[in-house]
Amino acid sequence: LTETPYHYGTIGAPTDNYMMFRRNSGRFGMNMFYGEFNYRHSFTDRHFIDFVVGYNKWKGDNDNYYQDSTVYYNDAALPTDYSYQYRPMRMNSNAWEVKLDYENPITDRFKLQAGYNGRFSHENTPQESFLDGSSWNGDNVVEDRAYYNRFIYDMDLHALYATLSYNIGKFGVMGGLRGEYWRVNTESYSWEQEHDASKREPAFKKDYFELFPSLFLSYQITPTQQLQLNYTRRLRRPWGGQLNSFKNTSDATVISYGNPELTPEFSNSFSLNYLKTWTQHSLLVSAYYRPTTDVMQRINYQSSEDGLMYQTNFNVAKSTSTGLEMTAKNKLWRILDLTTSANFYYYKLNGFDFDIDGQTVSGEGNHNFTWNARMQASLMLPYDVSFQATGRYRSRQVITQGHSDPSYAVDLGLRKSFLNKKLVLAVNCRDLLDSHKRKSYTESEMFTRYQENWHGGRRVNVSLTWNFGNMKQKRRPQQNMENQEESFGSQYSGSEME
């Protein structure tokens, strides 16, 4: 439950013209099913083929209630206005993943790895709206067809890869190439288009084929020290919601919508690494340089037609990150594993300008020094019980048209194995302190905006897993859980980095 006052008037005036008070409440339910089949064919202990098929079905019922009361100060004759909105959204998503991995140590020095990865996902999510324009409690709600939307999203991904590694003396080299074909179709229906197929516009379709080379060079200084020089090309893809052109008015201060023209962003990563190992500890220090093109960022603008604030995503500019990352792993008293990482870097985002809504939207280049840290503690307890705690912190960072404030979060997990580890019960609490929110400040010549975004708040998840056969247990994917760390409707939302 949140209660927010909105003040409307002229800057510098002694009083507001009017004030709207909004109460927002809601409930969210989620059901998820995940199944996975693993098979390994071994030619020898080191020469094998792995085959994995996974299926994930996810449903979420999201009900939001908005109660508004508006008081007019500049005209005492006007009565207080009341309105009630109910907006249910039924999220439906399913996905298949197929993996085939081949590994063959041809000689003691030469190894071949190759494989295929396919992902096939489908989302069909209707959103409805019911309105009572004269009541606080919603006594006489009617269907509000202007805000109906059905979003359909289909994504197919096919990737083939091959890597060759060769070691001679203290030197090692590994080179690889991944070819990726990505296809996405999106459809967004209004109420009229939902009920009359002849009014629907053709699905928005796009596809890409890209090559991603990688090269890793290493030198073993001593048995416990190693130098590495690496290069990889990566991409980050937009997620479905960033491509939905439906204009969402649930926020009283801004109308947000997706951009079907949004394309992936690409990075070239160069790094020099130093690795030091001890019996129970290790330290990895990495200096890196990472230029990125077609950076996906969320931009704000005031419409020249209706004067309202709008928010959407664009491939705005180029960026560069130059920094130092350190990762330490420590095993203490045989029962406690600590993994600590810290990333210190200088971030530069270039300026941009483009035409939208009959006007030129621009942003100046910006830069700052920023850092983030993450610590994970895993504790092994008696009776096949394990406990895990994870803490994350991100400092202030520049974004398009402004900056985002620091943020932090804590997650907890408890795991218990039964029947010789065939049956596993896991309880996880995401965002224990209910602190995982994103605060951002943006401005231009036309506006100044401060925004806070939450993403579900504290959540508890209980899962029961049964393992059979001889395959080693693998971590089950979580529906968009990891990506939420950088989401909150920001330029990082739910995107995929590879």
What name fits each language-model region?
Residues 4-20, 67-84, 122-150, 187, ...:
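Surface-exposed loop/turn segments flanking beta-strands in extracellular/periplasmic regions
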Residues 95-99, 142-148, 257-259, 263, ...:
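Outer membrane beta-barrel strand-and-loop segments of large Gram-negative receptors
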Residues 1, 41, 55-61, 118-122, ...:
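Transmembrane beta-strands of outer-membrane beta-barrel pores
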Residues 112-224, 354:
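Signature of Gram-negative outer-membrane beta-barrel scaffolds
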Residues 35-41, 98-104, 160-166, 215-219, ...:
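Residues on the lipid-exposed face of transmembrane beta-strands in outer-membrane beta-barrel proteins
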Residues 46-49, 109-112, 170-173, 224-227, ...:
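Repeated loop/turn-to-beta-strand initiation elements of outer-membrane beta-barrel proteins
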Residues 215, 366-498:
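Conserved C-terminal beta-signal and adjacent last beta-strands/turns
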Residues 183, 223-269, 289-311, 430-445:
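Surface-exposed extracellular loop regions of Gram-negative outer-membrane beta-barrel proteins
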